[in-house]
């Protein structure tokens, strides 16, 4: 058992988040499972009831002010579309750092760690985010997305003045991946590419159709980054059996959003040809 708690904050995707925790537990043994939600959807977890009404602002506040519920040195923070996949790649070296996230290859190496949707955060970092006067005085509008706020906006301050240690890119590449094919196998993942890589067709359909049912975000899923990276993964991994579902799903979009998807794919001609031809 590791000195690590699984932490999830979820108010919309209870069933999918429950499944993601279950998948992670086949690969990793945490000391605690902390669920901050409006519903106690994971029996045996440490349930913290909350009912946010102010969207991402309150969500970020809960994430950065949860130290009182944590009895371990670190948390493994997860979303509904992230989980651990390779127990053999866990190493206690991860716990030498206050923050590890999925690599951002669109950033220079010194700023590339990284995505928060599957991340390790130390209690020290969480307490700093909650209690530091300088951070507290920053306008909340600058704190979203919260992982960019931590890893880009205030990274220098955290590193130099608070001695927060961010994992180097080489370590993060063994920990997780998010938007592109990983250079090697990883302990876990976050996002569409990993879902295509690790779920079979029926599971993928279940996750996406359930997300559409319980969250009014079909437009975001099928026209935004999630679907773009899913199609990229389908193409690269040669999982062509996903193509009928992709066409079915996009057929449910209205004309405006359908053309948004086509525009996104036109940014990469290979993906466009694969998807529409």
Regions found by a protein language model. Name each.
Residues 241-252:
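Alpha-helical repeat scaffolds
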Residues 72-83:
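Short beta-strand-to-loop acidic/aromatic patch adjacent to the donor-nucleotide binding site
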Residues 258-277:
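TPR/TPR-like alpha-solenoid helical repeat scaffolds
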Residues 1-74, 257:
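N-terminal anchoring/stem segment of glycosyltransferases
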Residues 237, 252-257:
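Alpha-helical junction/boundary sensor with strong preference for TPR arrays
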